């Protein structure tokens, strides 16, 4: 993942780590956001879009059965619905991770276009649907959040406004 939490197997091991402390020291601002009802909001046809965009020859993607298979499997385990991925099975988490990594990559590319670079201006970490942002200024923090919002909306995902948190780092 572009915004992965490295070798940590839980959020608490990340927030208790040296890396967390280093980010609190290096960056003055922190924000936490998460995707609202992440698994329930995943639209299964999204995988067709991802595969077609990441295939050099889009004709190959249209002739490929991969996206059809993924879509059917997701619908079959979710009562034939194309809206939402059932929470629980490891397969669902892996499938969600494919989408979220694709979104991570697109967010990073959009931030680079805006002249922001990681780790000079910011660091972003994502653990499943929770996103942790460290930045040098509140303007950068807001630009990152806006970029996450606009990118995620293209894939029918939204941030949970009730869980949006921002503060100055304690160090």
Regions found by a protein language model. Give the residues of each.
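A short linear-motif detector with a strong N-terminal bias
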Residues: 8-12, 112, 138, 144-147
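Conserved polymerase palm-domain catalytic core
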Residues: 21-128, 133-142
